[in-house]
Amino acid sequence: MLSTSSDSHYQLKIASFNLFNFIAPPDAFYEFDNIYTQEQWQKKLNWIAKYLNEHQPDVIAFQEVFSPDELETLTKACGLDYFSVLDSPQVMDDFIYSKPVVALASRYPIKEAVSVSADKEWAAQMGLVSEFEFSRKPLRATVDLPKLGLCDCYVVHFKSKRALFDAQDIKANSATSSFRKSPAGTELNTGQLLAMEALGRWGSSVQRGSEAALLRYAMVERRSQTQNPMILMGDFNDILSDGVLAALTSVDTRIKPQADMSQGAMGDIAHQLGFYRLQDSYDLYQASQYSLSEQARPATHYYFAKGSVLDYILLSSEFDAKNDLSLAEVGRYETYDRHLINPSFEHDSQSTDHAPVMITLAIRE
């Protein structure tokens, strides 16, 4: 909730939370036997509620939502009176679901909510099929935030690193690839399997990177029309500094904007570029007066023993203290990872495989 700090700044908490297969029984996720017992489901609900009640986010993005009605009930019970979800998970077979969706909950009014679609013309220009779609539709919710006014909050869950296809997919598809043009009964050799695996993984990277680039274009289009501050939250399924996601934050350009003094500060070239820029909230925190020390960034996901930061909150120039038009700055950055690095079966067995991330914004008077 909105609070006042000792230095006369108002504080607002923004979070992102991958729920990890949030689906109410008796429905199943992906396979017919992936069904929570009532005890497991209640334990999962309690774990999420405990996080929400302890950390008190004002706006929170959710990923991996199969049961949006149950999530809305839970978040409203925790004081988040406004909720938005627009897409629906895919029904594979009766009670078996795939393709979970994203959602957003807020303490403050959601004035508008839309699903973001890929621009078909730009997708074609990029060499993609004109019917290109996001693997999971991003959500844009315009929230009326105290002291800030209308703010466009985007929730994403980009394509995972899981290969788009594997050898079994190729064998099952009668219309594909020269790899199958071998004598009947001949197995694919190791080299062919390795090459196919590389193709499948690169296919996922192309999808993920294209989603990032097309989302940024959609955000810039919206920003041009409304000038609303922007917050992008979600599970990126990749490292932000990796080239695949560079389109989200890159300001490298050959474009030389024309200065227009009649537009005041916005006529300045640096301000024109900065106005459409997104920055990692962690970097903004590290550069702020509130940063305590330079520390290694905590991972938000572990694959065996290897940790990676996959969950992010990106912010527009209004949240950059060094920007002349700044309205707020990042006063705190938190990664809730206790259940990942020191789990307790009693408390964490139905938690999540990601660490929720949360920032505290110090809003100027």
Specify the residue positions occupied by each region the protein language model found.
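Acidic/histidine-rich helix-loop elements
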Residues: F20-Q42, R162-S204
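Beta-strand-turn-beta hairpins that frame and shape the catalytic cleft
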Residues: S5-I14, F134-L193
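His/acidic metal-ligating clusters that form di-metal
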Residues: S182-N189, M196, S204, R208-L232
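Structured beta-strand-rich core segments of catalytic domains in phosphoester-bond hydrolases
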Residues: V65-D166
